A protein has these predicted regions:
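Catalytic domains of carbohydrate-active enzymes, especially glycoside hydrolases
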Residues: 142-164
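Solvent-exposed serine/threonine-rich low-complexity stretches and specific carbohydrate-binding patches
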Residues: 34-43
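Short edge beta-strand/loop segments characteristic of extracellular beta-sandwich folds
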Residues: 8-15
Length: 196
């Protein structure tokens, strides 16, 4: 999905046996009827595209190949529970310097001291956590200090991507998951955000 205020381009990889791909635009990330339905065009082997004119900022989309709707495997933002892709302008949501960010470089993999961390467990019972169980907890001074005290130089956060077994509309149910049921690999898990 590539957004501009004038139009939004949608592209999808679909297997060769796909006969038809339908794009649906929604007002909400969950529930409600489609505002617009567009038949996508096959533009290359296994690639389908559609361009929708107008400003779709804040709307949601799905692709349907006849087996149910989904946001596609390359979605980077979704509505609650990952059922629909979110149409956003990433230049407005990415933090300052995001595009220039570079990962740390180590001379050898043998130099890595890796800490595998369950995101929720890391901060959920911390009395001084402002954002217990949330991604924002990692930005708090105590979190960085704790990781430095451990002597680690790499953190493997699990789960970080959007997974399916925790209903983000019912976070008070206190369900637990290591992320072995991925839904959207390129989307942060909504249950760890401050506004799923």
């Amino acid at each position: 999905m590539t957004y501009t205020p004038e139009k939004t381009l949608f592209a999808l990889f679909a297997p060769n046996d796909a006969k038809k791909v339908t794009l649906r635009i929604y007002e909400e990330g969950l529930g409600g009827k489609a505002l617009k339905t567009v038949n996508m065009k096959r533009t290359a082997n296994e690639q389908w595209t559609a361009t929708v004119k107008g400003d779709l900022m804040g709307k949601f989309y799905t692709f349907d190949m006849g087996q149910g709707e989904c946001p596609g495997v390359f979605a980077k933002a979704v509505g609650v529970n990952g059922k629909r892709g979110a149409i956003i302008n990433f230049s407005k949501t990415d933090p300052e310097g995001w595009a220039q960010d570079q990962h740390p470089v180590t001379k050898s993999p043998a130099d890595l001291v890796i800490y595998e961390m369950h995101h929720r467990d890391f901060s959920i019972n911390r009395p001084d956590a402002k954002y217990p169980g949330k991604f924002m907890a990692l930005t708090e001074p105590w979190a960085i200090s704790h990781l430095k005290e451990l002597g680690v130089n790499a953190v493997h956060i699990l789960p970080s991507y959007d997974y399916g077994s925790v209903d983000e509309t019912r976070l008070s149910d206190n369900k637990y998951n290591w992320g072995y049921d991925p839904v959207n690999y390129n989307v942060p898990e909504g249950g760890y955000s401050t506004d799923p």
